[in-house]
Design a protein with these regions (language model features):
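Extracellular polysaccharide-degrading/modifying enzymes targeting complex plant/algal/animal polysaccharides
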Residues: 24-377, 382, 428-439
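Extracellular beta-strand solenoid repeats
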Residues: 69, 76, 82, 96-98, ...
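Bacterial N-terminal signal peptides
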Residues: 7-16
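Boundary at the C-terminal end of the N-terminal hydrophobic targeting segment
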Residues: 18-20
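Extracellular beta-rich repeat passengers
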Residues: 150, 155, 162-164, 327, ...
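Bacterial N-terminal signal peptides that target proteins for export
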Residues: 1-6
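Short glycine/acidic-rich loop motifs that flank beta-strands on beta-rich extracellular proteins
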Residues: 79-80, 298, 325-331, 370, ...
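Right-handed parallel beta-helix
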Residues: 312-323, 359, 379-390, 402-417, ...
Length: 612
């Protein structure tokens, strides 16, 4: 009788318990093992494949969710981690990839074998001779790895530059017809023979990166010409171009990436085609002991679904993502329209007007920036308590048809582009001023929550990027984030420069703390919007420390900036130290209430990241 009761109780208990599937991964594991705590896999890819097989076969491990546990250590990725519809979980059985300690998913490789450089090299500045160290670039596949980013002891090093970081010089002339920029003749000799020289051009709210083709010195001035395709783009697109004769002077520039410019500690240069790396160590850096990492991947994770078969219910928790590249400017240059979106073509219209916008005087076609984490055609793809750092371009990008997803309590720092990007910015053959209104509304990103994230020191490669950027989106909430130390705008919502209906609506920018913005560029806003977004709200934010960008050509930077055709917003209780706002050709349906220094102190103090 007792045995019968025990058996019955066990069966009832078994039916009431929801079992979960656990998979363990360690950098010291083995993919031929079982993926258990005692015998973990080595790669995350193997763990995800195991989870995929459990779901395909509907084994008992699926019932309570699948948890992939990452042990301490660095998981160097040789290829992008690809997550597909077959990896989907459900609301009752999600797939969770979580770090049990300090787990890092890295797209980098280590550089070793550093030696003092003792050879004679006439291009090196005299003051650095005897101070430079060299190493050979590793081979990835069948060629030397080429890169534009490098980190020494977890600190970003700078490419060899004409001036110290952040310093520029005013140009003399910008000639559209001849496709030339005239600059003061550099003090450094031999730059006309520099094979990989680039010019960074400061142009209002964006930058251009132009590969130098030739330099012709005429006394105190030097005329610079550039390679294609960027030369045509730079001189044909009207917005934004450099300014000559601005209120505060001409636009500025800086030359980078030649051995003759390697004159400051913390700078480096990579030779081509040998791949040899030259580095000028900072004080207290021992190159015999230093950890030097360069990126080999541009994209760490790609979550790729469709409207018909979305990826669903995948979550990353407490994971660090590091070391991604941004290489395209080395082969194509980089000329942007706004927000880091590079131009494919752009020009001024001799006769203004499109059917969608009668006053339009230019057209532009754009491409999306590269991203470390890409998400498409998905729902319930969440990042919780993660860290994103040491990245060349965008951090996380919810690109297309992403819904019901959250980025929560995460940290974004040392990122070359935008920290968080979401929504459609129509690219390729879709002209960027035409309203994006897809036949299937599910193509719009919607119901995304971005909250309690720290975003700081981003936009450090492409200064025209932003802290958080959203294009054509609806029902998006951006709340209680802290965004600081960005070179252009803090939080930007909207695209298209249009008063026409597009599907953008019901967006909320609430209780964020934005400070130290517009550090290098201007025509910026701590909070910035574009186009018609009915039912949208901007409230209870704190915006301060608007930086006086040192090379701006005018004073156009604002705490709140409603740029062209912004409409449908209620703006209330946003604290800033003065009412420095701007509305550029807004629509008629914006409602402004109390904003500025009169806003209650309680609202000011409660903006930003909430305590757990």
């Amino acid at each position: 009788m007792n045995k019968l009761l025990y058996t019955l109780a066990f069966c009832l208990f078994s039916q009431s318990v929801v079992w979960a599937g656990d998979i363990w991964v360690s950098p010291t594991g083995n993919d031929n093992d079982e993926g258990t705590l005692e015998a973990p896999f080595q790669t995350i890819e193997k763990a995800i494949k195991q989870a995929r097989e459990w779901r395909r076969l509907q084994t008992p491990e699926v019932n309570g969710g699948i948890y992939i546990h990452l042990a301490d250590g660095i998981y160097y990725q040789e290829k992008t981690l690809f997550i597909r519809p077959e990896d989907s979980g459900t609301s009752q059985s999600p797939t969770v990839i979580e770090a049990d300690g300090e787990a890092v998913i890295s797209g980098g490789v280590q550089i070793s074998g550093w030696k003092p450089f003792t050879d004679f090299e006439p291009r090196l500045p005299n003051q650095t001779k005897g101070k430079i160290w060299v190493a050979e670039a590793p081979s990835v596949g069948n060629r030397h790895l080429e890169f534009r980013q490098m980190w020494v002891n977890d600190r970003k090093a700078q490419r060899a530059s004409q001036f110290a970081d952040g310093v520029m010089e005013r140009m003399i002339n910008f000639n559209v017809q001849d496709e030339t920029i005239t600059i003061p003749t550099p003090l450094i000799q031999g730059l006309e023979d520099a094979p990989l020289l680039e010019m960074i051009v400061h142009q209002r709210w964006a930058i251009a990166i132009l590969r130098v083709r030739s330099m012709e010195t005429k006394g105190d001035s030097t005329v610079v010409r550039f390679h294609e395709p960027e030369s045509h783009l730079e001189f044909s697109h009207p917005w934004p171009q450099p300014v000559i004769g601005g209120e505060k002077g001409n636009s500025s520039f800086c030359l980078v990436n030649d051995l003759s410019l390697l004159d400051e500690p913390g700078e480096w240069y990579q030779e081509y085609p040998s791949g040899r790396i030259y580095y000028y160590p900072r004080e207290n850096e021992d190159m015999n002991q230093a950890t030097v990492i360069v990126p080999a991947l541009e994209n760490l994770v790609f979550v790729d679904g469709s409207l018909e078969r979305p990826v669903q219910y995948v979550k990353f928790k407490n994971v660090r993502f590091e070391h991604t590249a941004w290489n395209r400017p080395s082969s194509e240059g980089h000329v942007t329209l706004q927000g880091g979106f590079r131009l494919l073509d752009a020009y001024k219209l001799a006769t203004p007007g499109l059917p969608e916008k009668a006053t339009l005087e230019n057209q532009a076609w754009i491409a999306r920036p590269e991203a470390a984490i890409r998400v498409k055609g998905s729902n319930n793809i969440d990042f919780d308590g993660c860290t994103f750092q040491h990245m060349g371009a965008t951090g996380v990008d919810y690109e297309w048809a992403v819904t019901n997803s959250t980025i929560n309590s995460s940290c974004f720092t040392d990122i070359g582009g935008t920290a968080i990007l979401m929504g459609a910015f129509p690219d390729g053959g879709f002209e960027t001023h035409v309203p994006f209104k897809p036949i299937n509304e599910k193509e719009l990103c919607s119901d995304i929550l971005v909250q309690d994230n720290l975003i700081t020191n981003v936009t450090n490669e492409d200064w025209g990027c932003v802290g958080i950027g959203a294009g054509y989106v609806k029902n998006v909430t951006i709340s209680h984030n802290e965004v600081s130390h960005v070179n252009y705008s803090g939080i930007c919502v909207g695209w298209g420069w249009t008063l026409l209906e597009s599907g953008m609506k019901n967006n909320c920018i609430e209780a964020n703390y934005v400070h130290h913005f517009a550090q290098r560029l201007y025509d910026a806003g701590g909070l910035y919007t574009l186009s018609y977004q009915p039912g949208s709200i901007m409230r209870n934010n704190r915006i301060e420390q608007l930086t006086d960008a040192p090379y701006a050509t005018n004073e156009r930077a604002f705490y709140i900036y409603f740029d062209e055709a912004t409409d449908g917003y209620t703006v209330e209780n946003n604290w800033c130290p003065e009412e420095r706002f701007d509305s550029n050709q807004p629509g008629p349906n914006n409602v402004w209430k109390i904003n500025g220094p009169r806003v209650d102190e309680y609202i000011k103090l409660n903006a930003g990241i909430r305590k757990p």
